From Swiss-Prot:
A quinone binds at residues 215, 264-265. It is an enzyme of class 1 (oxidoreductase). The D1/D2 heterodimer binds P680, chlorophylls that are the primary electron donor of PSII, and subsequent electron acceptors. It shares a non-heme iron and each subunit binds pheophytin, quinone, additional chlorophylls, carotenoids and lipids. D1 provides most of the ligands for the Mn4-Ca-O5 cluster of the oxygen-evolving complex (OEC). There is also a Cl(-1) ion associated with D1 and D2, which is required for oxygen evolution. The PSII complex binds additional chlorophylls, carotenoids and specific lipids. PROSITE patterns: REACTION_CENTER. [CaMn4O5] cluster binds at residues 170, 189, 332-333, 342, 344. This is Photosystem II protein D1. Chlorophyll a PD1 binds at residue 198. It comes from Ceratophyllum demersum. Photosystem II (PSII) is a light-driven water:plastoquinone oxidoreductase that uses light energy to abstract electrons from H(2)O, generating O(2) and a proton gradient subsequently used for ATP formation. It consists of a core antenna complex that captures photons, and an electron transfer chain that converts photonic excitation into a charge separation. The D1/D2 (PsbA/PsbD) reaction center heterodimer binds P680, the primary electron donor of PSII as well as several subsequent electron acceptors. GO terms for cellular component: chloroplast thylakoid membrane; photosystem II. Chlorophyll a ChlzD1 binds at residue 118. The record marks 161 as: Tyrosine radical intermediate.
Length: 353
């Protein structure tokens, strides 16, 4: 009889825990995805802060030339970064216990792999938590779908690209200057500016910014007057009010006359779906582009594609970009190889002396 009571009490304890985890009454919703999200993101954040401040230099290229990335080793906020795991490690799983010592683990850039893998797991769980909370509240699932765009982008630069290139050392460094370095090298090696998926991503980000500014300014310009000239217009809105706070007919009429009638939405729901879908689809395409270029399916190559009747090359902007790419490729990892792959692939002319 005692054993039965103990089992019921433990089941009740587990039940209370489940109810607390899935309760929508908590100040912050936890959820089952949150059970995994919280420790992974806390780990990634903690290690990032410590490594950004105090990590020793990392042998990123695997040639015994460590690169400094932390504040205590001479960097500032702009130049500092978490240096990617060494090329000597490649794609190997490299937890602390796989190294001979903590010093070796730090020298080979172990913190980068730890941070990136925990971070990707954490943001994926955050996306799942968004869906979970929407489900519990009876909402539609589009918040999590929208968040999938930045999750896909982060996964592309931190995981898919290193897998395609064969080493975590090719992943994006975790810092401001490191991000710029990654972008420049990516352009040099993959000609991303000439990739149509990147172009769609640019249209998504810039177009999304434009549409957001247009929508916000139209709404703000067509607010229904509820206040005097001496009060803030924001005082005319009360949270939860049933009445519209702006005149969508006036906004529609203004924009329809500014451009043309059918350029303006007359349905608030389809308008807001469009505002969400445009940047999300654009960023999806960019992430897909990064993932294809990871395996060297690169941007368009129009180098020396225009010639005159004598066969002489007429340079276009594509040739200017190509020259810039070669210059950037020559400069990066300059001690790891003598020539960039484009130049080294050409057989050297023989000299008969």
């Amino acid at each position: 009889m005692t054993a039965i009571l103990e089992r019921r009490e433990s089941a009740s304890l587990w039940g209370r825990f489940c109810n607390w985890i899935t309760s929508t009454e908590n100040r912050l919703y936890i959820g089952w995805f949150g059970v995994l999200m919280i420790p992974t993101l806390l780990t990634a954040t903690s290690v990032f802060i410590i490594a950004f401040i105090a990590a020793p230099p990392v042998d990123i290229d695997g040639i015994r030339e460590p690169v400094s990335g932390s504040l205590l080793y001479g960097n500032n906020i702009i130049s500092g970064a978490i240096i990617p795991t060494s090329a000597a490690i490649g794609l190997h799983f490299y937890p602390i216990w796989e190294a001979a010592s903590v010093d070796e683990w730090l020298y080979n850039g172990g913190p980068y792999e730890l941070i990136v893998l925990h971070f990707l797991l954490g943001v994926a769980c955050y996306m799942g938590r968004e869906w979970e909370l929407s489900f519990r509240l009876g909402m539609r699932p589009w918040i999590a779908v929208a968040y999938s765009a930045p999750v896909a982008a982060a996964t592309a630069v931190f995981l898919i690209y290193p897998i395609g290139q064969g080493s975590f050392s090719d992943g994006m460094p975790l810092g401001i200057s490191g991000t710029f370095n990654f972008m420049i090298v990516f352009q040099a090696e993959h000609n991303i500016l000439m990739h149509p998926f990147h172009m769609l991503g640019v249209a998504g980000v810039f177009g999304g910014s434009l549409f957001s500014a247009m929508h916000g300014s139209l709404v703000t310009s067509s607010l229904i007057r509820e206040t005097t000239e001496n009060e803030s217009a924001n005082e005319g809105y009360r949270f939860g009010q049933e009445e519209e706070t702006y005149n969508i007919v006036a906004a529609h009429g203004y924009f329809g006359r500014l451009i043309f009638q059918y350029a303006s939405f007359n349905n608030s729901r389809s308008l807001h779906f469009f505002l969400a879908a445009w940047p999300v689809v654009g960023i999806w395409f960019t992430a897909l582009g990064i993932s294809t270029m990871a395996f060297n399916l690169n941007g368009f190559n129009f180098n020396q594609s225009v010639v005159d009747s004598q066969g002489r090359v007429i340079n276009t902007w594509a040739d200017i970009i190509n020259r810039a790419n070669l210059g950037m490729e020559v400069m990066h990892e300059r001690n790891a190889h003598n020539f960039p792959l484009d130049l080294a692939a050409v057989e050297a002319p023989s000299t008969n002396g």
